[in-house]
């Protein structure tokens, strides 16, 4: 996982996840804009295989935010979440009569960007 920090944005990137980008987008669309704690609850309860790598990525981004920037995890939210297609892994499966059948395993790159929520000043 590649982690970048720019301003108050904390970015975490996971590359070459053995998963279809279409299937990963199904989960990423559910967590975009949610708070950190709400995102972890959603990912724990969803029954999809892609939830585990996304969970690890969100957890890593939050750990980087607290360790490197000193930000509170409870105040952060998912500002941007993207899935891009990666390289296609190509293999051949042997078939009857000496033939072979191509197998294409899709991979994807997942990017999570955390931001800290702005606290509005109290008006007395």
UniProtKB/Swiss-Prot annotation:
This is Large ribosomal subunit protein uL22c. The keyword Coiled coil does not apply. It is found in: Plastid, Chloroplast. Signal peptide: none annotated. GO terms for molecular function: rRNA binding; structural constituent of ribosome. CDD domains: Ribosomal_L22 (cd00336). Coiled coil: none annotated. It comes from Amborella trichopoda. Part of the 50S ribosomal subunit. Belongs to the universal ribosomal protein uL22 family. One of its GO terms (cellular component) is large ribosomal subunit. InterPro entries: Ribosomal_uL22 (IPR001063), Ribosomal_uL22_bac/chlpt-type (IPR005727), Ribosomal_uL22_bac/org-type (IPR047867), Ribosomal_uL22_sf (IPR036394). NCBIfam families: rplV_bact.
